[in-house]
UniProtKB/Swiss-Prot annotation:
<keyword id="KW-0945">Host-virus interaction</keyword>
<protein>
    <recommendedName>
        <fullName>Virion infectivity factor</fullName>
    </recommendedName>
</protein>
<keyword id="KW-1032">Host cell membrane</keyword>
<keyword id="KW-0833">Ubl conjugation pathway</keyword>
<feature type="modified residue" description="Phosphothreonine; by host MAP4K1">
    <location>
        <position position="98"/>
    </location>
</feature>
<dbReference type="GO" id="GO:0016020">
    <property type="term" value="C:membrane"/>
</dbReference>
<comment type="function">
    <text>Counteracts the innate antiviral activity of APOBEC3G. Forms a complex with host APOBEC3G thus preventing the entry of this lethally hypermutating enzyme into progeny virions. Functions as an adapter molecule, recruiting APOBEC3G to the ubiquitin-proteasome machinery. Targets APOBEC3G for degradation through the assembly with elongin BC complex, CUL5 and RBX1. Binds viral RNA and affects the stability of viral nucleoprotein core. May play a role in viral morphology.</text>
</comment>
<dbReference type="GO" id="GO:0030430">
    <property type="term" value="C:host cell cytoplasm"/>
</dbReference>
<keyword id="KW-1043">Host membrane</keyword>
<feature type="short sequence motif" description="BC-box-like motif">
    <location>
        <begin position="147"/>
        <end position="156"/>
    </location>
</feature>
<comment type="similarity">
    <text>Belongs to the primate lentivirus group Vif protein family.</text>
</comment>
<dbReference type="GO" id="GO:0020002">
    <property type="term" value="C:host cell plasma membrane"/>
</dbReference>
<dbReference type="GO" id="GO:0044423">
    <property type="term" value="C:virion component"/>
</dbReference>
<keyword id="KW-0014">AIDS</keyword>
<keyword id="KW-0946">Virion</keyword>
<dbReference type="GO" id="GO:0019058">
    <property type="term" value="P:viral life cycle"/>
</dbReference>
<keyword id="KW-0472">Membrane</keyword>
Length: 215
């Protein structure tokens, strides 16, 4: 029996540019702010049996499960796309795995990483007390219908200037800008900022936005 070539097709998301921004932001949040300290980062490497290279970012999640985001380069040389990149997002646990979309990946990451509103924040907002928490991953809530409590807390977080010190919000925005700035720079720029203290409670803009995924 003549055996032809067997193909295994998996869904990937094409990205318009190089992956330095994604890799730099992951390293910044892993080694500088420690928000992703438990995440495993595997730099770009050549796959021995294939013609493409791959990098991996593995997020340990609750319930002994993991989310893995793989970045591929040079997947389709026969079409001349030698500099094209794509990513694959996979959730897996023991004995089961499935591919997920970027919005689902945001929800999975936020279930374990980055701070969010605490349970008592609604009561504090009703009593007019100072807010003690905020959501550093708002993109993770956009894939589902938000509750009235969450919408109210977002409004309080954005507009409640007389009741809370703006230091937290300024630091939040500063962390966000610093993260994206470092994501655009190379390793030399990281060394020049080695004397700066690490920022706490970093803001994460979302998987699709960082990778600039083309739907």
């Amino acid at each position: 029996m003549d055996q032809g070539k067997r193909w295994i097709a998996v869904p990937t998301w094409r990205v318009p540019g190089r992956m330095e921004k994604w890799h730099s932001l992951i390293k910044y949040l892993k080694y500088r702010t420690k928000d992703l300290e438990q995440v495993r980062y595997v730099p770009h490497h050549k796959v021995g049996w294939a013609w493409w290279t791959c990098s991996r970012v593995i997020f340990p999640l609750k319930g002994n499960s993991h989310l893995e985001i793989q970045a591929y380069w040079n997947l389709t040389p026969e079409k001349g796309w030698l500099s094209s990149y794509s990513v694959r997002m996979t959730w897996y646990s023991e004995g089961f795995w499935t591919d997920v979309t970027p919005d689902c990946a945001d929800t999975l990451i936020h279930s374990t990483y980055f701070s969010c509103f605490t349970a008592g924040e609604v009561r504090r907002a009703i009593r007019g007390e100072k807010s003690l928490s905020c959501c550093n991953y708002p993109q993770a809530h956009k894939s589902k219908v938000p509750s009235l409590q969450f919408l109210a807390l977002v409004v309080v977080q954005q507009n409640d200037k007389p009741q809370r010190d703006n230091t937290t919000r300024k630091q939040w925005r500063r962390n966000y800008r610093r993260g994206l700035r470092l994501a655009r720079q190379d390793g030399r720029s990281h060394k020049q900022r080695g004397s700066e203290p690490p920022a706490q409670g970093a803001y994460f803009p979302g998987v699709a936005k960082v990778l600039e995924i083309l739907a």
